[in-house]
From Swiss-Prot:
One of its GO terms (cellular component) is cytoplasm. Belongs to the methyltransferase superfamily. Tam family. Its main location: cytoplasm. Pfam families: Methyltransf_25. It is found in: Cytoplasm. This is Trans-aconitate 2-methyltransferase. The gene is tam. Gene3D superfamilies: S-adenosyl-L-methionine-dependent methyltransferases, Vaccinia Virus protein VP39.
Length: 260
């Protein structure tokens, strides 16, 4: 998959940052010395951490060089490291008080081992806070798979849906963490985002979920694929009374705290 596009991602920054705010609001820490943003993207969520914990060492982790460059420009006082969450671990003696993963772990596989490993990396009393989109069965994502299965695109796209991991059920995450945590808080929210048009919905998902489908296509095939996808979106999201479309966006939240 090609590198991420920070400018495209930021076009819907308010909508993307809202769940980051709501995740952070449930983090039961009054202070922290070291906080880590796993999958920091362009730094919108990292900025929330820096404001919430002034004076803390703030570290952002991401695989994307473009996203990290954008984050460094936004937050020059923070530390940003290019690394894969699947292999990342804190340095000895640098266990974080907060591991914060907003809309990133859905791109990392092996949650049955990943989640307990991240939790074990926390300092005593530390918190693991996770938010993940739970929208694979929404029309926005079903339509991606349906169009990708059609000729002439299916051979080039292949199994693009496999790039994003199949997340577990919310009760499964509770079961992973409850035996080892002091407390576990889980909840599920479906946001309803008013969107100006079907094209606006396509633009939103082009910055994230649609990338694995579009990137493998030859340049000559991309416009046709996107046009077919937009027709599917137009049919799936009817115009509401004010002329807008409502994009339902389910998200899962997990906040677990270690014993002191």
């Amino acid at each position: 998959m090609h590198d991420w596009n920070p400018a495209l991602y930021r076009r819907f920054e308010d909508e993307r940052t809202r769940p980051a705010h709501e995740l952070l609001a449930r983090v039961p820490l009054s202070a922290a010395s070291h906080v880590v943003d796993l999958g920091c993207g362009p730094g919108n969520s990292t900025e929330l951490l820096a404001v919430r914990f002034p004076g803390a060492r703030v570290t952002g982790i991401d695989t994307s060089a473009a996203m990290l460059q954008s984050a460094r420009e936004r937050l020059p006082a923070a530390e940003f490291v290019q690394a894969d969450i699947a292999a990342w671990a804190p340095q000895p003696g640098e266990a974080p008080d907060l591991l914060y993963a907003n809309a990133s772990l859905q791109w990392v596989g092996g949650h049955e081992s990943l989640i307990p490993r991240l939790f074990a990396a926390l300092a005593p009393g530390g918190v693991l806070a996770i938010q993940m989109p739970d929208n694979r069965q929404e029309p926005s994502h079903r339509t991606m798979r349906e169009v990708a299965a059609q000729a002439p695109w299916r051979d080039a796209i292949g199994d693009a849906a496999a790039v994003r991991t199949r997340i577990l059920g919310i009760a499964d995450y509770y079961d992973l963490l409850a035996p080892i945590a002091r407390s576990v808080d889980v909840w599920h929210t479906v946001y309803q985002h008013p969107m100006a048009s079907a094209a606006a919905i396509v633009e939103w998902v082009s910055g994230t979920g649609l990338k694995p489908f579009v990137d493998p296509l030859p340049e000559a095939q991309r416009a046709g694929f996107l046009a077919a996808y937009e027709r599917g979106i137009d049919a799936a999201y009817p115009v509401r009374a004010d002329g807008q479309r409502l994009l339902a966006f389910p998200r899962m939240f997990i906040v677990a705290r270690r014993s002191a």
